[in-house]
């Protein structure tokens, strides 16, 4: 039998520094290849599929099991964009006894439909227009996304798929000092209107790194939180692993 292989940039154990599982010890499996071209990406090396080493699912499972510590909480399937590899992820996780987190840009609803049942938690990264300084599509991975509007429609589809499958889901939006509070409020209002069960979807506002650029802009974060809070349960959580010097 020929085993599937997928390009993996790295597998490592660390503390989750983002979102609602912040502080949890996780084993991170970072897939190579991404279909988007976000200006703030903190792992640009993972955009190119050729950047990863090819692994089979049994090879990855052996590495994961060797990294488990007494404080281990869950496996984070991240990237890049892991939804590019639904068949491989199915092979990797369908027999796994461990809790799992999917970290995704939410751009591939049909693939999310195929593997949502494999996850306990999901973080869907909502993209806004200012995240893309040029073309929103990655030049290294094929994509048929036509515009930021098309992208957010897909992200909402993925959120609804995950919630309907019982996955503990939150959405995250990375903000910059230039991001308007009204824009974030309008985004939260749209999520309230379009998500099937919005009461099950918290919104995490994540200030982009480095944190020093926010020294004179903390009132803006409070304004964003206040505007989003009119519609959703909202958190403001920076990248804690960056502050601690962790991966």
From Swiss-Prot:
Per its UniProt record, the required cofactor names are:
[4Fe-4S] cluster; S-adenosyl-L-methionine; Mg(2+)
- Please tell me whether the keyword Calcium is annotated for this protein: no
> Which residues bind [4Fe-4S] cluster per the record?
34, 38, 41
Top enzyme class: lyase
User: Which InterPro entries does UniProt cross-reference here?
Assistant: 7-CO-7-deazaguanine_synth-like (IPR024924), Aldolase_TIM (IPR013785), rSAM (IPR007197)
Give the range the annotation lists for the signal sequence: none
From the UniProt record, give the pathway where this protein acts: Purine metabolism; 7-cyano-7-deazaguanine biosynthesis
Chain sites annotated for binding S-adenosyl-L-methionine: 80
Report the coiled-coil segments: none
Q: Which UniProt keywords apply?
A: 4Fe-4S, Iron, Iron-sulfur, Lyase, Magnesium, Metal-binding, S-adenosyl-L-methionine
Q: Which GO terms describe its molecular function?
A: 4 iron, 4 sulfur cluster binding; carbon-nitrogen lyase activity; magnesium ion binding; S-adenosyl-L-methionine binding
This entry's comment on the bound cofactor is:
Binds 1 [4Fe-4S] cluster. The cluster is coordinated with 3 cysteines and an exchangeable S-adenosyl-L-methionine.
- Residues holding substrate: 15-17, 30, 78
Q: How does it assemble?
A: Homodimer.
This chain belongs to which protein, by name? Answer: 7-carboxy-7-deazaguanine synthase
Provenance organism: Methanothermobacter thermautotrophicus (strain ATCC 29096 / DSM 1053 / JCM 10044 / NBRC 100330 / Delta H)
């Amino acid at each position: 039998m020929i085993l599937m292989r997928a390009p993996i940039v790295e597998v490592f154990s660390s503390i989750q520094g983002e979102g609602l599982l912040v502080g949890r010890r996780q084993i991170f499996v970072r897939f190579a290849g991404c279909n988007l071209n976000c200006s703030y990406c903190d792992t640009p090396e993972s955009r190119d599929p050729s950047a990863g080493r090819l692994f089979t699912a049994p090879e990855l499972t052996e590495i994961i099991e060797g990294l488990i510590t007494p404080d281990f909480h869950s496996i984070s399937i991240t990237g890049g964009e892991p939804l590019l590899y639904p068949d491989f992820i199915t092979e990797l996780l369908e027999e796994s006894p461990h809790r799992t987190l999917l970290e995704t840009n939410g751009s591939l609803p049909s693939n999310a439909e195929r593997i949502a049942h494999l996850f306990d938690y999901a973080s869907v990264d909502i993209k806004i227009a200012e995240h893309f300084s040029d073309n929103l599509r990655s030049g290294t991975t094929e994509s048929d996304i036509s515009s930021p509007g098309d992208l957010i429609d897909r992200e909402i589809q993925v959120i609804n798929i995950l919630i309907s499958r019982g996955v503990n889901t939150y959405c995250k939006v990375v903000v910059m000092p230039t991001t308007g509070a009204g824009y974030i409020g309008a985004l939260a209002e749209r999520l309230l209107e379009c998500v099937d069960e919005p009461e099950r979807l918290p919104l995490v506002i994540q200030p982009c790194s480095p944190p020093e650029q926010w020294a004179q802009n903390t009132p803006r974060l409070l304004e964003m939180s206040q505007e989003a809070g009119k519609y959703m349960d909202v958190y403001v959580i920076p990248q804690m692993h960056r502050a601690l010097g962790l991966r």
